[in-house]
Amino acid sequence: MLTGEIPIKIGQMPAKTSPKPRKVKADDPGSLVDWLKAQDDDSLRDLLVHRPDLVHPVPADMAKLAARAATNSSITRVLDRLDAWVVGVAEVIACLDEPFTKKELSALLKEDPELDRALEVLKARGVIWGSDKGMRAVPVLKEVVAPHPAGFGPCFIEERPDLEAVATKERIKQILDKAPKGVDEVISKVLWGPPVLVVDKLNREATTSSAKTPYEYLMAQGVLIATGRHELTLPREVAFVLRGENLLPEDLSKVPEISIKNQRDPQAVDKAAGGAGLHFVQMMEELLDIWGENPPAVLRNGGLAQRDLTLASRICDEDENIAALLAETALAAGLLAADETADPLWLPTPAFDLWRTRTVQERWATLAEAWLTSTRVPSLVGKNEQVRINALSSEVDKPLAPEIKSLLLKALVSLPLGAEPNEDELVAHVKWQRPRREAELIDLLVRSFTHEANLIGARGLGALATTGRALGEMRYTMPSPEARTAAARAAVADPKGHVIKTDPLLVEAIAPLLPDAIDHFMLQADLTAVIPGPPESHVAAELRLLGYQESRGAAQVYRFSESSLKRALERGKDKDEIMEFFKKYSSTDIPQPLEYLLNDLVRQLGSVKITEDPIDDTEPAPGEKRSTVKLRPRPAPEGSPPDAPLLFSAIKALRLSENPKAKVPEVAKSPEPMSPEKLVPFLSEAIEQNQSTTISYAEGDGTIKARFVDPIRVQGGLLTSFDHLELRIRDFALSRINAASITKAKKNGK
């Protein structure tokens, strides 16, 4: 049987879909609403996790949930996240009359054992429902997979009744046996889709005897239908017969294998990854330090000028692609942002100051998490031939990026330790996972992210390291991009009280691969300082101010010169402070040449006494503009799953909507008065402990009412919770809550 690839396209579907009469009587599974009502809480929870758009906002009842689940946009999102086999089965289902049975569908797919998995996935996501003896699909499925579901063309049986005689195994065999040379090649072009051919020279009046080309012969025999002056279409009725026992390509249900290009020593892989991770952290700190002193301007399109990117690459002694990766990762981690002045600049945020105080392992984990969930694609920088794409611009955003990284890591985790994969097969594997996505974009993303994983320390020597496996395994439990952005915003608002959280699994994974940070160095007579390992952050920052870094890596070298020491003195350092730093952290004596150089510079510049500034250090200096660092909004990856409290409350609201006569639980006692500074921690703890609370709330008309609620989240001055009185999820302004307490309700009012 001829084989090929299934094209996935979206468009309008013809009303008549099934080319064959029904042979099996199926049970009617009823409506989607009835099916949803019959599902248990675990099934509903799975549905909402896989389709987060259904709970934003939470529907009022099951009918509204079913209506939203059957919309074009929602079903499109579902199919866009399914693999080629499940998508193919869904498209075949769209070609069948309803209700259909599992037995009927299985017969069309050569009894493929993977059919059970496909049906289970489609049911779990609400695309189809029912039992093996009778199933239906959401009506909009036909529209979403149009115009060529599973590569099929439209049905022509009503327009061309003669097709009934053509679309049989016997007749098709006769036609092909007598066919001229080239017919097989023509059929192979349309059999698996798209089913339309464009032919330059076509005699639409040709008969079997007068046909001069394979196209005209097939048209004359009714195998192809002329649908335009130069257009031929393979009817669905004929395609069903030509494909035989399997309406989908033979190997579509098999996950593409990834061969091993090279087998590396896992310890060598981890060592290389650890070195890359350390280097990435060091480059990030150095770049943001320099941008803190000389911030680049923000372009009108919100990006970074090419000259600034080039300068950044020189600073890091790396190519521009790595400089773009550093800048984009800093933005994603909330360490870099544009300020709000009239002439905005790219500046490190207060979160950067907090980040640099953490251990090198924690700093790496922060960057790795940000990279994994970032929608930024640094490899796009400079790629457009018409208009140059700048780093940090909106053109670098691709919402698909986090999903592809997750799939990529999942594929790499499945390989043996130390395995370097064949990159082309890796690309094909990810494309199979997301066949409806743009193939060219997936190719770019997979190859780019594979390279970036080497640079950030997730891979080493071309193979996945321990760090990369940790990234792959925690992809579903890590903080969402929204949560990390909120954390960075909180750091901007309250840099002293905020703590940036990192995933302990990542810290644990990178820790054995990095040497311990050290707080000493060796001063040399040649005016250099040698650090035999990764330095503590504050030591490295001071050395960068006093000297110029000559080498990076496990051991670093800083060179002091007249210009570097003069720079430090002009920025407020005095001789005694510099000498004290050298004495405290140098494991060797201070060389005389270094001391002489410092003394000469002090005499040249004059004596300057450095004292405490009596002015509040939070106020800008006279004539200095205060700039506010603003975190630019970033698009979150599609379909961030709802958190557990929201899922719990959403299901509760849907259940209670089906029983409107249910009694509101009685509150055991009145809420206790609570000050504003204690309210947020109290509610946060209630959310963490999954506890119901009673709040005293000032309504819009001024009345004070006690509300029995299940808190979900506290964000943006609002408490989102399930309100037992109104049986829905709603927001309460924190400023209107004057009392709160943990509630133990009397069940059923007893």
Q: What is each PLM-predicted segment?
A:
Residues 100, 197, 707-709, 732:
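A broad, structural micro-motif
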Residues 136, 233, 694, 718-720:
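General beta-strand recognition
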Residues 709-715, 721, 727-729:
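Low-complexity, glycine/alanine/valine/leucine- and proline-rich hydrophobic stretches
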Residues 267-278, 282-284, 360, 367-694, ...:
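Extended alpha-helical interface modules used as scaffolds for assembling large macromolecular complexes
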Residues 133, 229-230, 341-343, 527, ...:
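Beta-strand-connecting loop/turn residues
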Residues 697-702, 723-726:
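Short acidic, glycine-rich loop/turn motifs
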Residues 728-737:
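A short macromolecule-binding patch
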Residues 2, 6-437, 597:
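Short, amphipathic alpha-helical interface elements at domain boundaries
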